């Protein structure tokens, strides 16, 4: 299997405990872990462009496949929220029209299938789409994601970066989230005692692809 | 005159006792106090039992522990709960030999009496704190 970069917009470590998750807490004890730092306001498109461009940027090219990270890694894209509807092999509208179960299952299914042939960059947007206005379903959303990550690992993915570009939604406004997201990966970071910046996630995935494929 | 008075050890003891009485009277409403060099000493001295969560922004398990501390602050209103960012206040962390994060330190009458390192289930932390409560 080829390396994968999977971003889950709007999840936080705190809810691993609150929702008594099974897979993600165990995973973070096995591989490298860190905290993604992204100050308010945090928007999905701007956050993802920073990752794809591997630098803090306001540059938003019209075609995500031309972004430096995509060109360097030749990664396939799945459900990337730089545009609405999302960009890639699987795509949804950034509203509540697609249920969180459907999105998570389809992204993970496409990921496992595609990672057999190429590196993959994928996103899950469900927490961001559903938790701004409805915290009561939080642990249901987290449980579906947790289980899906389990099937991803069982599906043979062994080189990965799982992250959230920002933490959980705080209140109804689109750009309001907790400022700290998750980073769980099979590639070690050079500065362990520092938070992970968005542009570094792109660079780390480039390094992961290079080290895994020897390119 | 005011300066002379503040150097009086008897007066300091009296003020400290009074502050404790006030703190006892005011129930903790479940909030976790953000601590720094200007309020740390007062915080640990004015609570019979105080619990301090030493954390840092880069520490993933620290974020996992946070909801447990918040929950305990609600369930144990007679205990003072605070958190200290060790990146912003390294001197305080060094003073208490905090080597790993997260570290939860339990203070009784201002002195450290116990500590728990890492993320542990709420029940374990609660039992450790309860051991230092008088009633």
Residue ranges and their predicted role:
Chain A
Residues 2-3, 10-116, 198-215:
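Active-site-proximal alpha/beta segments of enzymes that process anionic O-linked groups
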Residues 3-13, 23, 141-173, 183, ...:
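Metal-dependent active-site segment of extracytoplasmic phospho-/sulfohydrolases and closely related
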Residues 20-26, 138-141, 176-179:
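Glycine-rich, phosphate-binding/catalytic loops in enzymes
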Residues 54, 123-125, 186-188:
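Structured loops at beta-to-helix junctions and adjacent beta-edge loops in soluble globular domains
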Residues 129-133, 166-177:
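Histidine-centered active-site/metal-ligand motif
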């Amino acid at each position: 299997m080829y390396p994968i970069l999977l971003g889950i917009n709007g999840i936080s470590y705190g809810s691993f405990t609150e929702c008594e998750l099974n897979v993600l807490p165990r995973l973070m004890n096995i591989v490298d872990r860190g905290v993604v730092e992204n100050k308010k306001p945090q928007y999905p498109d701007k956050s993802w462009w920073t990752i794809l461009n591997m630098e803090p940027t306001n540059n938003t090219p019209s075609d995500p496949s031309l972004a430096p990270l995509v060109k360097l890694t030749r990664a396939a894209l799945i459900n990337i929220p730089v545009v609405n509807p999302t960009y890639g092999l699987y795509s949804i509208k950034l509203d509540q029209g697609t249920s969180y179960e459907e999105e998570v299952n389809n992204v993970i299914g496409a990921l496992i299938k595609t990672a057999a042939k190429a590196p993959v960059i994928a996103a899950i947007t469900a927490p961001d789409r559903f938790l701004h206005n409805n915290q009561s379903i939080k642990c249901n959303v987290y449980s579906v994601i947790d289980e899906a990550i389990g099937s991803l690992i069982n599906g043979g993915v062994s080189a990965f970066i799982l992250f959230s570009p920002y933490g959980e939604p705080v209140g109804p406004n689109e750009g309001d989230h907790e400022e700290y997201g998750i980073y769980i990966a099979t590639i070690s970071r050079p500065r362990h005692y520092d938070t992970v910046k968005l542009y570094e996630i792109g660079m780390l995935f480039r390094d992961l692809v290079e080290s895994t494929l020897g390119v | 005159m005011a300066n002379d008075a503040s150097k009086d050890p008897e007066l300091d003891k009296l003020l400290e006792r009074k502050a404790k009485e006030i703190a006892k009277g005011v129930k903790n409403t479940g909030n976790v106090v953000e601590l720094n060099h200007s309020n740390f000493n007062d915080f640990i001295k004015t609570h019979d039992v105080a619990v301090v969560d030493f954390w840092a922004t880069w520490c993933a398990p620290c974020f996992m522990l946070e909801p447990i501390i918040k929950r305990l602050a609600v369930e144990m209103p007679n205990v003072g709960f605070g958190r200290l960012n060790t990146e912003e206040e390294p001197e305080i962390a060094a003073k208490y030999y905090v080597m790993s994060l997260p570290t939860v330190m339990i203070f009784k009458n201002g002195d450290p009496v116990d500590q728990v390192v890492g993320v542990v289930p709420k029940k374990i932390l609660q039992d450790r704190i309860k051991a230092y409560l008088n009633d």
